[in-house]
Every structure is written in C-alpha cells, then in structure tokens.
C-alpha cells in the first residue's frame, strides 16, 4: 500500500489551491478537494456537491461528472475520472483511491465523456456500498469456519494413517478366544445348526408376566 501512495500525487502533497478568479467559484469551491464545489445553498449551509475534472490535452475543457450528496463522494468521483484520464500523472484527493476505487474500464474512456461519466457513477456507488456494508457474523467467524473445514480434511486422514500402520492389529489368539481362525469359524457354523429352545423356556418368572414377547425372537 505504501508503494501505491508514493506513486500518486495528492492534494495534500501539492501546493495550496490558487484563489479562484470568479466570485461564484470563490464562494462554492471546496477548500481542499480538487474538482469539487458546492451547488445551491448559502456559503456554510448544507447543499449538494458537483464534480468536474480537467480534460488532458484540451485547454479549458472540463468533464462534468455529476452531482453528489457529499463532498467526499464528489472527491472520489474526481479521483476515479482522473485515474482513467491521466493514469500515474493524476493528482488525487485521497491517496487510497488508487486501490480502493473500482477502476474505470478503458472502453468507457474510449466511449467519450458520457462513457466516463457513467463509469465513474458506477464506481462511486460501488465504493460507497462497500464502505457502508457492516461486517456480518459469518465474516467475523470466517477464520473459525476455515479452521473447522481444515480439521475435517486433516483428522480422517490422520486416523486412516494410524489404522493403516497396524497400530491396533490383534493376534489370532486374542481375536478368536485362543482358537485358530479355522476352528473358530467352524464352531460358529455348528452353532447356527442348533435348534432354538422351546417356547417359554426363556421366560422370567414374575418379571415378564402379561408380556407376549419371547426372548428368543430371532
């Protein structure tokens, strides 16, 4: 950001404005912002602000950019147009306009005064909307959400690596009750061939009185 600030001239680094020749301009011109003057109302009273910018290579020609509710908005409009028309040679009202203001497309400059004016209005509106937008809870906890997403990706992989490494591998004697695998599965097969006990053999006296559900239900 410091590089961008040093690359552009600003009204704060330039010599003070020369006194305006016409009385009207002396009364309405903004004391600091370049290309901005008040429209309507008495000096010192609230009013709207207009903006115009000098056209490079056309002596005495100015490009009218429109009327704005605040002097700051008009000053931002001046910066957007100056960047489009003059590039690095532009003198800005705000040093951060070089990177905070949406750029005016080159096609707008080629379209003439109307194209530049329309593009500047869009840029100022986008800048004001972005500056006024409050930070939402989703943005406040965005980092926490990202961390959770990272954990979702990392933890299963780590667990898979542990199991793949055989850290929980058991020997056959522990898994099959002291028998080898063949004898263990053979005993299971024999158990499936045994007839279930007679109905009522597994009733608990007194505890399941009145219940029709046999314990041997499979």
Curated annotation (Swiss-Prot):
Residues 32-95 bind DNA. One of its GO terms (molecular function) is DNA-binding transcription factor activity. GO terms for cellular component: nucleus. The keyword DNA-binding applies. The keyword Manganese does not apply. Keywords: Activator, DNA-binding, Nucleus, Stress response, Transcription, Transcription regulation. It is found in: Nucleus. InterPro entries: AP2/ERF_dom, AP2/ERF_dom_sf, DNA-bd_dom_sf, DRE1A-I. Gene3D superfamilies: AP2/ERF domain. Belongs to the AP2/ERF transcription factor family. ERF subfamily. Transcriptional activator that binds specifically to the DNA sequence 5'-[AG]CCGAC-3'. Binding to the C-repeat/DRE element mediates high salinity- and dehydration-inducible transcription. Confers resistance to high salt, cold and drought stress. This is Dehydration-responsive element-binding protein 1B. It comes from Oryza sativa subsp. indica (Rice).
């Amino acid at each position: 950001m410091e590089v961008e600030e040093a690359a552009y001239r600003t009204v704060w680094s330039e010599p003070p404005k020369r006194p305006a020749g016409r009385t009207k301009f002396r009364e309405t011109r903004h004391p600091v912002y370049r290309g901005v003057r008040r429209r309507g109302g008495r000096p010192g009273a609230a009013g709207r602000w207009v903006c115009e910018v000098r056209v490079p290579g056309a002596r005495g020609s100015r490009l009218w950019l429109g009327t704005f509710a605040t002097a700051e908005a008009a000053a931002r409009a001046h910066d957007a147009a100056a960047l489009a028309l003059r590039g690095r040679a532009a003198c800005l009202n705000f040093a951060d306009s070089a990177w905070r203001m949406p750029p005016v497309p080159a096609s707008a400059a080629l379209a003439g005064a109307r194209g530049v004016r329309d593009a500047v209005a869009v840029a100022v509106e986008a800048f004001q909307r972005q500056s006024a937008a409050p930070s939402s809870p989703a943005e406040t906890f965005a980092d926490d959400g990202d961390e959770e997403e990272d954990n979702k990706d990392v933890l299963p992989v780590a667990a898979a690596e542990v199991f793949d490494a055989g850290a929980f591998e058991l020997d056959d004697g522990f898994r099959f009750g002291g028998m080898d695998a063949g004898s263990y599965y053979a005993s299971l097969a024999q158990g499936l061939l045994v007839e279930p006990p007679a109905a009522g053999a597994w009733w608990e006296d007194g505890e399941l009185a009145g219940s029709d559900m046999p314990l041997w239900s499979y």
